[in-house]
């Protein structure tokens, strides 16, 4: 009987006035939720995401966006311990080994020691265009500018060399097919010394291409500028014409009215230049060794600098080719 009474009392305690008790419990739950909600702080920031690729695969195209907004909810008490740099956004694509287009989810990794109550991303997926990753050696085109403080323009770049001359580049196969040369950033040099050795920064043709090195070494040798001189009606030399053949109207070819000249950069004085011309040290030469029968031929011109004129540089000349009519020599005709 005692046990029965106790059970009845417990039932009365639980179910008597149950409506009021249910309301009290609901109010308690709401108060608990409201209390905890007020302790949650919401932070919105913009972050870049990383793309993890297989070693054999490269991005074939830059994604339409590289940053997304992320909303982070964390307990107010933990807020001071939150380091946003330790919230990592990434796309896991390391298992993909075949080029193509893939829509992949953006994943989140929390490296903070505190608990993050909730994450919310403005975008959850990214479309990636992937290509085969290849490499090749590409020639470097240096860009530099000579600055003279006094503005006299007395110096010029006599020669230079690049180390290395070619650079190994990596990137998507379709992009690397378009790349034959790589340029550097423009760098200015002054004329305080006649030899300059410095670094040039290599410029990526686009963000998809990576370099083995980011810099190359350039060695520049300066010299005083040459004076520019045009030698009109230079000496003409016809070499190796076979016996039994001759040039028709040779005297008309050498006619001073024809467009013939040699432009040189030189440190030589006008008197020295004239002496070289008179001594036929600067000439246009034509090699006729390949001509075996009479006919009309276009022969390429070559420059001959006799006596090794070290301080002379040829930068233009005419003609580049000359048309010759070769006939049988009159000396062997009956």
From Swiss-Prot:
Top-level taxon of the source organism: Bacteria
Keywords, alphabetical: Membrane, Repeat, Transmembrane, Transmembrane helix
Gene3D superfamilies: 2.170.120.30
Domain (YbbR-like) ranges: 43-128, 138-220
Pfam families from the UniProt entry: YbbR (PF07949)
GO cellular component, as recorded: membrane
Sequence intervals crossing the membrane: 22-38
UniProt entry tagged with the keyword Membrane: yes
Membrane topology listed for this record: Single-pass membrane protein
Primary subcellular site in the record, as a coarse category: membrane
Localization annotation: Membrane
Xref: InterPro entries: c-di-AMP_regulator, YbbR
Protein name: YbbR-like domain-containing protein BB_0009
Gene source species: Borreliella burgdorferi (strain ATCC 35210 / DSM 4680 / CIP 102532 / B31) (Borrelia burgdorferi)
């Amino acid at each position: 009987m005692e046990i029965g009474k106790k059970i009845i009392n417990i039932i009365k305690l639980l179910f008597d006035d149950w409506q009021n008790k249910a309301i009290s419990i609901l109010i308690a739950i709401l108060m608990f939720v409201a209390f905890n909600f007020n302790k949650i702080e919401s932070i919105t920031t913009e972050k870049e995401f990383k793309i993890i690729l297989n070693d054999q695969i490269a991005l074939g195209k830059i994604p339409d966006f590289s940053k997304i907004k992320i909303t982070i909810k964390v307990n107010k008490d933990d807020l001071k311990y939150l380091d946003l740099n330790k919230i990592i956004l990434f796309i896991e694509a390391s298992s993909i080994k075949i080029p193509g287009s893939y829509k992949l989810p953006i994943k989140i990794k929390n490296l903070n020691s505190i608990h993050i109550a909730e994450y919310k991303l403005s975008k959850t997926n990214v479309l990636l265009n992937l290509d085969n990753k290849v490499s090749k050696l590409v020639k470097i085109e240096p860009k530099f500018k000579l600055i003279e403080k006094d503005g006299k323009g007395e110096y010029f770049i006599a020669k230079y060399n690049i180390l290395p001359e070619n650079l190994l580049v990596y990137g998507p196969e379709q992009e690397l097919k378009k790349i034959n040369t790589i340029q550097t950033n423009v760098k200015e040099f002054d004329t305080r010394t006649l030899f300059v050795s410095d670094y040039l920064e290599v410029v990526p043709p686009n963000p998809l291409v990576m370099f083995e090195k980011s810099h190359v070494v350039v060695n520049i040798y300066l010299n005083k500028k040459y004076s520019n001189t045009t030698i009109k009606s230079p000496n003409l030399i016809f070499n190796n014409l076979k016996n039994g053949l001759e040039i028709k109207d040779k005297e008309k070819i050498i006619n001073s009215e024809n467009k013939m000249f040699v432009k040189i950069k030189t440190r030589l004085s006008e008197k020295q230049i004239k002496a070289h011309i008179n001594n036929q040290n600067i000439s246009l030469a034509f090699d006729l060794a390949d001509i075996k029968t009479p006919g009309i031929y276009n022969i390429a011109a070559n420059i001959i600098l006799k006596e090794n004129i070290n301080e002379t540089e040829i930068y233009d000349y005419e003609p580049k080719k000359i048309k010759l009519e070769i006939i049988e020599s009159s000396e062997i005709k009956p």
